[in-house]
Amino acid sequence: MSDHEVKMVVLSTENLDESIKFYETLGFSLKFRDGAHFAALDGGAVTLALATPVDHPIPGKVVVGIKTADVDAAAKEIEATGGAIIKGPYDDAHERRAVVYDNTGNGLVFYSPLKR
């Protein structure tokens, strides 16, 4: 079994309220909202996240969020296998993150909750 688990898909939006309303009409309920720039919707096993450019890892792109125990090691692994680190690894308010491109340019964000 992999140490990495796909847990989130991040979509870009310029208007968080309109996007939340759109996805709620499809039956996705709001799990979490951070101001006017980020929302997490219940997509079952995978969270559907909506983010404005303020909080989006790669604005304008679809990004897959992968939960992992070791963000730093995952980022190094990406670099070693032909991908590229875009940002990080770094700590934000809630988690450790690394924003990367895979070997074909797809956006990924590896993350792990910070231990408090």
UniProtKB/Swiss-Prot annotation:
Family matches, as InterPro entries: Glyas_Bleomycin-R_OHBP_Dase (IPR029068), Glyas_Fos-R_dOase_dom (IPR004360), VOC (IPR037523)
A Pfam short name: Glyoxalase
Domain of life: Bacteria
Boundaries of every VOC domain copy: 5-113
Crosslinked residue numbers (Isoglutamyl lysine isopeptide (Lys-Gln) (interchain with Q-Cter in protein Pup)): K76
Keyword Isomerase listed: no
Keywords per UniProt: Isopeptide bond, Ubl conjugation
Name of the molecule in the record: Uncharacterized protein MSMEG_6630
Biological source species: Mycolicibacterium smegmatis (strain ATCC 700084 / mc(2)155)
